[in-house]
């Protein structure tokens, strides 16, 4: 038995698994036969011992494994099935193996075919196993893991790459060459400039940081252009400098790149202010714009009266509407020259007021603002409005598909009207529903008041891009979530659990495992000596790291119960427990200083994690939802905040966390997924709970 235990240890079998193996008489007998005179380090021989039925020809199969004819478990299982029904020779078995071998190239081709056949990733493994039972399963899994994820931790589907853009109304959008234009000359000139490629833009206003809703728009714009071989601008809508700050320009660019997207070019509406001023003069000359001296409040009141009177008397909109063109040109030039004060004059569009659309009631196109532009560091005399800048910037950048959220639908008419009057290229507009997510708020108007509670915009409890990044959400998971939603006109609220499923699934596959105890309980093991054990970074990973073991360890306080009950499966004075990757222990006595235990040779009911005496202290910030209600109400969302959404523990981690860097992600076994916070220093590692495990043992 001692020799067998050494063989198992040499094969890298974990201590708890060794305890189980030596209790299985059939496996022990198989191992004694198989390893006699053969390579004791061959893990496949151990597999044969574990899976071989009683009547198997162990000698023949072991010889084939030892000779490296059978090289992996899948082929071994097929050989076992083949030999079940008849006696075969070494030569026949060798021919069987050669005949059924599946190369890595064959696996790659089969996975590629499944992708082209639109097989969901969750179904690929079973299909591959059925079609290629003799293929090396590790190679199959490696190839399938290269496929973009299409299934989360539950049953919700993620489309294959590009597939999410081929469903619903979005797949009906016209090609660049099919987009209606004022005339064919404009269309052909545009196609020459772009080469007929799709051009999109993501146009955020630099007055705050991005959130999960923006991530959906970013994915749409960048991925739609990519699908058709096009490109995407990142364009700052910087037409409202009083609400904008220089820091947000850099912050937005950083967030877009962190999500994995690289803009074709970074621009701003302000890059085209001079051109928009020229267009202002052009519209005046066409009789489509005039200088107005009404205040903003007066303009709103005049519009209200115009709609309520129902007389269609356009002079109600402004007494300045019918000024002569020459006077409008002179006054607008005075505005440009800085001769008018803020609020004393603006340029309004002379629009088609027969429509019922309130955004066609002579919009303000250019106004005077007494402020220095935060990006240009220039004090412009006149500033175009959002309504003017959006469509003109889209046209000047040859944007083919202008994507906006549904609330901008009413702006479509004014957008097209302006481009027609200017006789320039006209993109197609397409609206989609805004992303609302449960148990949170997203608007800047609601987020800024949180500062008085000590909650900044990058707080891990918020669903801003920076908040999610700090919490440890992988950008790939955020993108997959956004692409899973599809596009509809109906506005709904998505359960945050859907996003969490994507995050958990990603972290389960990618995050290094660490042992950590949140509330340490000291255990002294009497009959033990210091040693070092090798633990893989991930289950099945070839990358292993050494973890020191000392006679004094710490376990989770909740893993011990002085007076246990029948449902408690971990350590009690009467019930031993196994230590992960080590051996079982049992309690000798309980003292004020902790537990005194000793090594035990039995088979425990449960294994628990632990850390050694020289472990690393970490500050654990255990976050939960900032709002417990599914949809926080506008009027009471501050009162609805969860006052217990952050709890701080000072836990102990094994030595593997010593080299952690900010934003590194880990799975703390049996606790959850964590991310190293930016507050970390050399003296103090701070980690944020990203998301709990689905089932905490």
Swiss-Prot record:
GO terms for biological process: glutaminyl-tRNA aminoacylation. InterPro entries: aa-tRNA-synth_I_CS, Gln-tRNA-synth, Gln/Glu-tRNA_Ligase, Glu/Gln-tRNA-synth, Glu/Gln-tRNA-synth_Ib_cat-dom, Glu/Gln-tRNA-synth_Ib_codon-bd, Rbsml_bL25/Gln-tRNA_synth_N, Ribosomal_bL25/Gln-tRNA_synth. A motif ('HIGH' region) lies at residues 204-214. L-glutamine binds at residues 237, 386. One of its GO terms (cellular component) is cytosol. The keyword Aminoacyl-tRNA synthetase applies. Its EC number is 6.1.1.18. It catalyses: tRNA(Gln) + L-glutamine + ATP = L-glutaminyl-tRNA(Gln) + AMP + diphosphate. Keywords: Aminoacyl-tRNA synthetase, ATP-binding, Ligase, Nucleotide-binding, Protein biosynthesis. It comes from the Eukaryota. It holds the Pfam family tRNA-synt_1c. ATP binds at residues 205-207, 211-217, 405, 434-435, 442-444. GO terms for molecular function: ATP binding; glutamine-tRNA ligase activity. A motif ('KMSKS' region) lies at residues 441-445. It is an enzyme of class 6 (ligase). NCBIfam families: glnS. Belongs to the class-I aminoacyl-tRNA synthetase family. This is Probable glutamine--tRNA ligase. The lineage of its organism: Eukaryota, Fungi, Fungi incertae sedis, Microsporidia, Unikaryonidae.
């Amino acid at each position: 038995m001692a020799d067998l235990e050494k063989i198992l240890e040499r094969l890298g079998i974990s201590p708890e698994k060794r305890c189980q193996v030596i209790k299985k008489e059939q496996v022990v007998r198989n191992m004694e036969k198989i390893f006699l005179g053969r390579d004791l380090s061959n893990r496949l021989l151990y597999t044969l011992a574990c899976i071989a039925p009683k009547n198997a020809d162990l000698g023949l199969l072991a010889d084939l494994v030892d000779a490296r004819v059978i090289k992996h478990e899948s082929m071994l299982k097929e050989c076992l099935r083949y030999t079940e029904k008849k006696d075969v020779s070494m030569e026949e078995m060798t021919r069987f193996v050669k005949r059924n071998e599946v190369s890595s190239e064959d696996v790659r081709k089969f996975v590629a075919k499944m992708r082209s056949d639109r097989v969901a990733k969750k179904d690929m493994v079973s299909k591959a196993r059925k079609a290629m039972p003799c293929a090396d399963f590790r190679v199959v899994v490696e190839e399938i893991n290269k496929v973009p994820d299409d299934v989360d931790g539950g049953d919700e589907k993620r489309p294959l790459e590009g597939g999410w853009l081929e469903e619903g109304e979005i797949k009906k959008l016209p090609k660049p060459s099919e987009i209606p234009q004022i005339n064919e000359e404009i269309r052909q000139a545009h196609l020459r400039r772009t080469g007929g490629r799709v051009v999109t833009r993501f146009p955020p206003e630099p007055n705050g940081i991005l959130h999960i809703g923006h991530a959906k728009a970013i994915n749409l714009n960048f991925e739609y252009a990519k699908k058709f071989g096009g490109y995407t601008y990142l364009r700052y809508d910087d037409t409202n400098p009083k609400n904008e700050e220089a820091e947000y320009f850099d912050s937005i660019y950083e967030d877009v790149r962190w999500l994995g997207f690289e803009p074709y070019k970074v621009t701003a509406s302000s890059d085209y202010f001079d051109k928009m001023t020229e267009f202002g003069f052009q519209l005046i000359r066409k009789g489509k714009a005039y200088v107005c001296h009404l205040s903003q409040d007066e303009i709103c009141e005049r519009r209200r009266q115009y709609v309520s009177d129902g007389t269609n008397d356009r002079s109600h909109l402004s007494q300045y509407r019918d000024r002569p063109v020459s006077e409008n040109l002179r006054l607008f030039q005075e505005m440009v020259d800085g001769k008018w004060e803020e609020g004393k004059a603006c340029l309004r569009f002379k629009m088609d007021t027969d429509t019922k659309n309130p955004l066609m009631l002579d919009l303000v196109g250019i106004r005077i603002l007494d402020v220095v532009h935060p990006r240009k560091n220039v004090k412009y005399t006149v500033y175009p409005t959002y309504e003017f800048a959006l469509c003109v910037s889209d046209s000047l950048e040859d944007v083919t598909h202008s994507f906006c959220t549904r609330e901008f639908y009413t702006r479509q008419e004014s957008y097209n009207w302006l481009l027609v009057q200017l006789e320039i290229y006209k993109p197609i507009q397409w609206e989609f529903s805004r992303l609302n997510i449960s148990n949170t708020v997203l608007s800047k108007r609601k987020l800024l008041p949180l500062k008085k509670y000590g909650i900044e915009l990058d707080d891990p409890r918020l669903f801003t891009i920076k908040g999610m990044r700090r919490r440890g959400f992988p950008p790939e998971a955020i993108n997959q979530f956004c692409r899973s939603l599809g596009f509809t006109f109906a506005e709904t609220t998505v359960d945050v659990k859907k996003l969490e499923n994507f995050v958990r699934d990603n972290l389960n596959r990618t995050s290094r495992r660490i042992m950590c105890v949140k509330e340490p309980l000291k255990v002294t093991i009497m009959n033990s000596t210091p040693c070092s054990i090798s633990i893989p970074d991930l289950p099945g990973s070839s990358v292993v790291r050494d973890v020191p073991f000392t006679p004094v360890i710490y376990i989770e306080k909740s893993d011990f119960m002085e007076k246990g009950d029948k449902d408690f499966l971990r350590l009690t004075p009467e019930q031993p427990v196994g230590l992960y990757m080590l051996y079982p222990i049992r309690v000798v006595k309980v003292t004020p200083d902790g537990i005194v235990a000793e090594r035990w040779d039995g088979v425990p009911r449960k294994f628990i994690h632990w850390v050694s005496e020289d472990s690393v202290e970490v500050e654990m910030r255990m976050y939960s939802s900032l709002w417990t209600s599914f949809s926080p109400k506008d009027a009471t969302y501050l009162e609805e905040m969860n006052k217990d959404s952050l709890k701080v523990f000072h836990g102990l981690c094994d030595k593997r966390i010593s080299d952690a860097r900010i934003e590194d992600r880990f799975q703390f076994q049996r606790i959850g997924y964590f991310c190293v916070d930016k507050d970390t220093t050399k003296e103090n590692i701070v980690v944020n709970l990203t998301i709990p495990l689905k089932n905490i043992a």
